[in-house]
């Protein structure tokens, strides 16, 4: 155990709960996601003072202490949490999907059959395991640090910071997509938005308006997400009904394995079916997260898959195939072919509003992640400051700045770069998930994936293989840029420790957070920069 060097010791709480039955398949685990275990006995809390001083976050099996009222342990009382079930489902929907806008490249890259198979198989291989991990660890650590705290408590604060850096950067890159998609859908009706100064001004204006919406608070964002979600999906429901008489099932079976752009195909599928863990950085704002978060994830998985397959089947089955036309924005053209100009304008309007929903949901996740990291002492304290609406102002401004810097990249470049960074972060999450199971098998888990440790390892084999494939298929340019970004994070954490030691910026730990390690004063001058 590391020497504390005169730091104040804190008592840690070991929470034990009854065991949960294990299942044998991922499908059974996914079904269980729909109902969090609410029949547990109240966990008993025993004080356990380490013999040689308290350990830093992530060492010696320190555990997260739950609230005594049965709510999943969190830094905020239930009365201060504002996000309920329905808004949470739509926030997850927009974190992950937002509708079928952007899935067109999967058909252009691989044809109808592989696109349909991809959106049926990848949710089982990737989305369900990621949602299950998020349900268990998000309920176990219901604070705004989310996956940063999962990794920090398992691997230590250095790797927790790396997780936060890669995931935040990936999220900001992801958010830079939405102005691009928004303008791609509008440029057929407003050609001036296709490039040049009008496009640049449109990106800046849109980013400013949506950033202001985030500033007004999660309650506003959540209910706006519901309204946008309903409006954005309605035209596809209508398009599917119009397409019924024109469907030719044989068109769904078209495949040409000799003409597949595997890199574009996998990156498009992966981008449209990941980011289930992003909602964890809002867990500190969710009402009764131990019950609400797993249920919301269950419903959101079904919601997302149906929202992709329904228009994909309608578009590929009712319109003769021209793979060259299947690029982002093509659903508006399909709507015009099937229903006329009125349906095309409706789809374009829905795309615009959907991108607004995805933007505000992603920015909420990114900005609250920075707040959560600051509350754990990983970032300067000004990131933890909240506006009068309870929102993280510094995190919002930093995230918006990143979006503006990256929004001039092309759609495909953005997708490939964010997927590369996201993969590294997911590998750390997988390791943290297994380590928590091995080191803390009896820790309180309001929701527990109904698999034993061996079953959890088996569940993670397919997604790990998928990550390897996505990384292997990345272009040299994307790999160099992404690895450069990773290297920046490796240097940035020691640099921040140096700044802390010099007292150039203030760092602090929120005392209201449950204890998962040492609450320490600023770094001592003789402390190593990297733990």
UniProtKB/Swiss-Prot annotation:
Sequence ranges of Low complexity compositional bias: 17-33
GO molecular function: polyamine transmembrane transporter activity; symporter activity
GO CC, alphabetical: plasma membrane
Protein name: Polyamine transporter PUT1
Family: Belongs to the amino acid-polyamine-organocation (APC) superfamily. Polyamine:cation symporter (PHS) (TC 2.A.3.12) family.
Top-level taxon in the UniProt lineage: Eukaryota
GO biological process: polyamine transport
Organism: Oryza sativa subsp. japonica (Rice)
Keywords, sorted A to Z: Cell membrane, Membrane, Symport, Transmembrane, Transmembrane helix, Transport
Transmembrane segments: 83-103, 113-133, 147-167, 193-213, 224-244, 262-284, 296-316, 341-361, 391-411, 414-434, 453-473, 476-496
